[in-house]
From Swiss-Prot:
Subcellular location: Golgi apparatus, trans-Golgi network membrane; Cytoplasm, Perinuclear region; Cell membrane
Family annotation (SMART domains): EFh
A Pfam match: EF-hand_7
Gene (name only): CALN1
Protein name: Calcium-binding protein 8
Amino acid sequence: MRLPEQPGEGKPENEKKGDGGALGGGEEPPRSQAPDFPTWEKMPFHHVTAGLLYKGNYLNRSLSAGSDSEQLANISVEELDEIREAFRVLDRDGNGFISKQELGMAMRSLGYMPSEVELAIIMQRLDMDGDGQVDFDEFMTILGPKLVSSEGRDGFLGNTIDSIFWQFDMQRITLEELKHILYHAFRDHLTMKDIENIIINEEESLNETSGNCQTEFEGVHSQKQNRQTCVRKSLICAFAMAFIISVMLIAANQILRSGME
């Protein structure tokens, strides 16, 4: 994940151009590699069901007046569904709240090693009622307007991503083409190395939990289609989560900078 630059920090003098990682095709310079984490530290696989995951009345609830409220009112059901799934991935224990520990584990699984100060700032930004955890309403109130802005929609169109992965499933585009399409869509938030790492991690996670992946396809001949659907949905979820965490890091950096002025 492209990290927001902190005041007084610069790039290492010995930074050299890399070869793009194990999958090849990368154009980003190498960064310090995060240590390997045990399986439980990796992002868990959450299958995206065929039906909508969030059918509540969130859009009908009263929100604070202002432009943020207007932007939230313009969120489509599909966009809300994707944001809800990203929240579910961050909520590792499924209790309906994101804790500071869960947020830290999610960020580490994507290769970013947050300090306690950074985690505290992000949690303070998200935790509006001060109870030490983040529920979905808080998650949406803070991040929703950012995700549905003109810039956000360009990188967070789930239907477009879904179409890209469908083409990959049907072998209409190669892995290299897939990576470069995703890099073009997310280049303001993710590096090529990030994209390669997410694909590798999601493939490994899927292999470890393949028995838990269920889709609407049944029968022996649908095994390949089930596999393709699970990979595609898992990757969509991972990229949505990475995008949201990137937005959170930008917000945290803005708070840090404003506090030093």
